[in-house]
């Protein structure tokens, strides 16, 4: 199916209203909003002006975005710090905002989550060879974004009993 529809272009004023609704629905990054504004057919100067305005009105707040991203990915998906940082960087979030977002993670709960994931995966892992099993568990936890030193400590604890 060919798409001959021409993307409607908006005036900066119309785009501001649409972008405000887009940001009000859920937290957005500057990068996401910038892409949306360009899709409205705006000129680069107008896009940057609207980004500044939306930021001043707190409709775009990257620190708040980072905090809610961390709460979601850590709280629901049990991602580790490394995977969360990588996800935020890919969305163009500054190092400062990433650092602020990571403060949402309770260090004690973080290790409990790691141990819980390890025990759950260990219970379902079919590999009998201890070396291969350890390697599979390590890969799994690293894919979840946990730090290798914490993984090694957790594995030692599991093996000791």
Which residues does each predicted region cover?
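An alpha-helical, amphipathic repeat domain used for nucleic-acid recognition
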Residues: 1-161
């Amino acid at each position: 199916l060919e798409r001959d529809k021409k993307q409607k272009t908006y005036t900066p004023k119309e785009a501001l209203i649409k972008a405000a609704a887009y940001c009000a629905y859920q937290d957005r990054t500057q990068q996401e909003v910038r892409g949306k504004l360009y899709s409205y057919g705006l000129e680069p100067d107008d896009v940057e002006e609207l980004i500044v305005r939306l930021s001043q009105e707190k409709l775009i707040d990257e620190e708040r975005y980072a905090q809610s991203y961390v709460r979601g990915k850590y709280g629901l998906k049990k991602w580790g710090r490394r995977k969360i940082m990588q996800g935020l960087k890919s969305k163009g979030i500054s190092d400062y905002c990433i650092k602020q977002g990571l403060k949402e993670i309770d260090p004690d709960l973080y290790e409990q989550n790691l141990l819980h994931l390890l025990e759950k995966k260990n219970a379902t892992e079919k590999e009998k060879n201890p070396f291969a099993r350890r390697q599979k568990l390590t890969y799994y936890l690293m894919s979840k974004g946990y730090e290798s030193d914490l993984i090694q400590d957790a594995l030692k604890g599991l093996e000791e009993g």
